[in-house]
C-alpha cells in the first residue's frame, strides 16, 4: 500500500509537469539504489565492481570511486550495508571500501554472520558478529560524514513508522545523525533472522532519542528505488547546483537500480489446491515471499512507467536476475559453494540482454551509464571552475 501510494504521488506530479526543456547533463541528478537480500548482496556487488572499473577506465583514474559520481546512493538491508561501504570515509576522506572489496567482505564475514545460533526461540542468528564487524569497519562515523547523500531505510517497531537516514534530513531532525554501524545493523535486522536493534542519539535540545529498529525491507519491501528517487527529488529542489530543474523532470534524473535476484519459478511453486490446505504458519511464510516478489516487480513497473511518460526510459536501468534456482534463492546460505554460485550469477548477468526486446546487454548498458556519469562529472567540474 505504501509503495502504491508513493508511486501515485510521483506519477501525478509528473503528469503535472509541463517542462519540455532539454536535459542539461551537468545538472542531472544521479541515483544509485541497491536492494536488500542478505548474502545475495554478492550479485549487486559484482555489478558495482564492474561499473566502478568502467569509471576508472573512462576517466583514466584508478582511484575513481562510485561516490564521486552519484548524488544519492540508497539501500536497504544488505543494500544499506553496501551503501555504507562505498560512502563512509576513511582517514583520507575517501570511501573506505572500493567496489572490488565488497565480494571479499562477504566471503570473509558471511559464514560468521549467518552462523545459526541454535536457539529454538528468538531469531535464527544472534547478530553479535554482524554488529562487531560493522563497528570495526565503520568506526564512529556518522551520517553527516557520508561522502554523498545517502538514503538508508529502517523501521521503528516502537513508533510503528519507517525511519529514513539521509544527510539532508539532519537540519530538521538532528537525532537522525546516528553512527553508521548502528544504521547498517538496523537496516539488516530482518525479522526472524536477526534481533531488532536498540540505540540512542540526541535531539537538538540534548534530549535522549531512542530507536527500536528492524530491517529496512519492512519499510521499503526490499527495493529502495522509490525512496532513493524521492530523496533525489528533494535534493534537486533544494540544491543550487540543480537550478535548471524548475519542476519534477525525469529527463534530468539518472537512476541505476540493482536487484539481488528473484526466483523465476516462484509462480509455479504453488497451486490453489495446495494452498487451500495451508495453515496460518505456512501462509505467513508464503505471504512474505509473495510480498517481496510482487513489490520488486511493481516498483520496477512503476518507475519504468514514470520515466517512459517523460520520454526518459534510457535514464533508468534496472539490473536484476530473475532466474535464481536452488540455494542461490536463499538470503542466508553463506556456504562457500553458494557464494561462488552467486558470483557466477552476477558475472553471467552482465552478459544477458537488458530485456527480451533489446539486444543491449547489461554490460553494454553499464558502459553507457559510465560514460554518462563521467561526462556529467567533468561538465560539473568545468562549470564550478567558472
From Swiss-Prot:
The keyword NADP is annotated on this UniProt entry: no
UniProt xrefs under PROSITE patterns: PNPLA
Catalytic residues (positions): 77 (nucleophile), 215 (proton acceptor)
Compartment annotation: Vacuole
Tissue expression pattern: Tuber.
Glycosylation positions in this chain: 115
UniProt-listed Enzyme Commission number(s): 3.1.1.-
Domain of life, source organism: Eukaryota
Assigned keywords, A-Z: Coiled coil, Glycoprotein, Hydrolase, Lipid degradation, Lipid metabolism, Plant defense, Signal, Storage protein, Vacuole
Function statement: Probable lipolytic acyl hydrolase (LAH), an activity which is thought to be involved in the response of tubers to pathogens.
Protein name: Patatin-10
Organism of provenance: Solanum tuberosum
Lineage of source species: Eukaryota, Viridiplantae, Streptophyta, Embryophyta, Tracheophyta
Amino acid at each position: 500500500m505504501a509503495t502504491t501510494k508513493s508511486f501515485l504521488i510521483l506519477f501525478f506530479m509528473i503528469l503535472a509537469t509541463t517542462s519540455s526543456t532539454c536535459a542539461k547533463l551537468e545538472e542531472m541528478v544521479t541515483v544509485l539504489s541497491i536492494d536488500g537480500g542478505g548474502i545475495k548482496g554478492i550479485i549487486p556487488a559484482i555489478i558495482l565492481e564492474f561499473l566502478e572499473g568502467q569509471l576508472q577506465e573512462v576517466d583514466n583514474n584508478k582511484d575513481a570511486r562510485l561516490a564521486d559520481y552519484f548524488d544519492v546512493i540508497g539501500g536497504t538491508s544488505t543494500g544499506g550495508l553496501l551503501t555504507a561501504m562505498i560512502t563512509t570515509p576513511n582517514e583520507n576522506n575517501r570511501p573506505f571500501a572500493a567496489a572490488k572489496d565488497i565480494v571479499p567482505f562477504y566471503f570473509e564475514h558471511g559464514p560468521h554472520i549467518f552462523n545459526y545460533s541454535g536457539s529454538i526461540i528468538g531469531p535464527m542468528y544472534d547478530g553479535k558478529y554482524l554488529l562487531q564487524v560493522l563497528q570495526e569497519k565503520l568506526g564512529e562515523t556518522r551520517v553527516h560524514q557520508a561522502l554523498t547523500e545517502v538514503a538508508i531505510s529502517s523501521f521503528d517497531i516502537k513508533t510503528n513508522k519507517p525511519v529514513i537516514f539521509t544527510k539532508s534530513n539532519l537540519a530538521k531532525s538532528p537525532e537522525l545523525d546516528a553512527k553508521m554501524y548502528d544504521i547498517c545493523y538496523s537496516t539488516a535486522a530482518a525479522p526472524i533472522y536477526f534481533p531488532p536493534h536498540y540505540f540512542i542519539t540526541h535531539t537538538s535540545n540534548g534530549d535522549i532519542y531512542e530507536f527500536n529498529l528492524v530491517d529496512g525491507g519492512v519499510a521499503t519491501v526490499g527495493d529502495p528505488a522509490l525512496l532513493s528517487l524521492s530523496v533525489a527529488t528533494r535534493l534537486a529542489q533544494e540544491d543550487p547546483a540543480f537550478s535548471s530543474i524548475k519542476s519534477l523532470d525525469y529527463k534530468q534524473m539518472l537512476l541505476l537500480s540493482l536487484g539481488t535476484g528473484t526466483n523465476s519459478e516462484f509462480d509455479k511453486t504453488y497451486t490453489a489446491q495446495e494452498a487451500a490446505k495451508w495453515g496460518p504458519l505456512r501462509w505467513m511464510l508464503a505471504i512474505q515471499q509473495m510480498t517481496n516478489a510482487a513489490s520488486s516487480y511493481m516498483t520496477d513497473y512503476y518507475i519504468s512507467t514514470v520515466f517512459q511518460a517523460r520520454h526518459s526510459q534510457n535514464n533508468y536501468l534496472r539490473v536484476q536476475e530473475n532466474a535464481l534456482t536452488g540455494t542461490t534463492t536463499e538470503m542466508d546460505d553463506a556456504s562457500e559453494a553458494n557464494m561462488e554460485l552467486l558470483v557466477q550469477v552476477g558475472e553471467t548477468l552482465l552478459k544477458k540482454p537488458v530485456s527480451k526486446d533489446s539486444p543491449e546487454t547489461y554490460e553494454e548498458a553499464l558502459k553507457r551509464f559510465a560514460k554518462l556519469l563521467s561526462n556529467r562529472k567533468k561538465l560539473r567540474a568545468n562549470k564550478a571552475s567558472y
